[in-house]
Design a protein with these regions (language model features):
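Mobile, glycine- and charge-enriched loop segments
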Residues: 1-20, 57-86, 201-202, 209-212
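Conserved, mostly hydrophobic/aromatic
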Residues: 6, 33, 60, 97, ...
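Active-site gating/metal-coordination segments in enzymes
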Residues: 39-40, 50-151
Length: 292
């Protein structure tokens, strides 16, 4: 029924971030997916100093090999990789991971600007590969992870314009908060509530063919559930550009891990979205965009 467009797994589920349960391993994800009709998942390696505990692309490929047909591996390299040179041919590395089975890049969480020369070189290489890229957008520099952008998402907009051949799967609190006009810039750091007066995200999705919405994590679900009436319009209008995801960052089985799937099923049962719309968001868009 579902393809999870946004998943993480460590080789061993032992690392525990402050205030969190340990991160999942591949076996735990598969057990959860089997219970909840999740057929496949895009497995995203987490790299770089911005995150709790970096991992390797090879960990992801190993998990995909252990569970054939269940995990779709992405790869990830820091923009400063190879020679710490904004002109490095990062595509040379990507080609090797493509040959190993990777289908895209992400989750890109570098705490740098969209306009940083290292970032634009990364985007250039990804566009050359004709790959999608999953990104986390950040609201600030420091004590944070994700590509920094200002209110209104001008950096994302320019990136979409400059690299039209690069499909961007965007998510994060900062990104999804901008489904609506912001009351204050600080709302980008969390999960704003209340009625949606249309903000930057739907406008960018209309303008740029290469922008897609990764609905994973509490941020994607909150963007919909904060205003169900607007969510129905949004899901119907952008039915070809939205993808179901969970983003499990702890031992699977917490209530919020099923919030989005339950919300989509509710809208389907109430006739607010059609079976066609449900199927596209649940898995068909992922199949089409990843060439599965």
């Amino acid at each position: 029924m579902f393809i999870d467009i946004h998943a993480h797994a460590y080789r061993k589920a032992f690392f525990q971030a402050p205030g969190r349960r340990p991160w999942p391993n591949a076996d735990q994800l598969i057990e959860f997916y089997d219970k909840h009709e999740v057929e496949k998942a895009v497995l995203l390696p987490l790299i770089g100093p911005e995150f709790y505990l970096p991992q390797s692309n090879e960990d992801i490929l190993e998990a995909a090999e252990r569970f054939p047909g269940r995990f779709i591996p992405f790869c990830n390299i820091h923009p400063q990789a190879i020679y710490n040179d904004p002109f490095s041919k990062l595509e040379d590395v990507f080609k090797q991971y493509r040959d190993a089975g990777c289908k895209g890049v992400g989750e890109v969480i570098c705490n740098m600007s969209f306009f940083d020369p290292f970032m634009t070189n990364l985007f250039r290489a990804i566009e050359e590969m004709q790959w999608p890229m999953t990104i986390h957008v950040a609201h600030r520099y420091g004590r944070c992870y994700g590509i920094y952008d200002e209110p209104g998402l001008p950096g994302l907009a320019e990136t979409l314009q400059r690299f039209p051949g690069m499909k961007v799967f965007a998510h994060s609190q900062t990104f999804w908060a901008e489904i609506a006009v912001l009351d204050t810039p600080h709302e980008r750091a969390g999960y704003p509530k209340g009625k949606v007066i249309e903000g930057a995200v739907p406008k960018l999705m209309r303008k740029y063919e290469n922008l897609y919405g990764d609905l994973s994590a509490g941020s994607g679900c909150n963007a919909l559930t904060r205003d169900e009436e607007y969510a129905v319009k949004f899901l119907n209008e952008f039915q070809d550009k939205l993808m179901f995801g969970i983003d499990i960052c702890s031992a699977p089985g917490e209530p919020h891990h099923v919030s989005l799937m339950n919300f989509l099923k509710k809208l389907l049962a109430e006739g607010k979205i059609s079976q066609t719309v449900f199927n596209k968001i649940a898995k068909e868009n992922a199949i089409r965009l990843l060439g599965l």
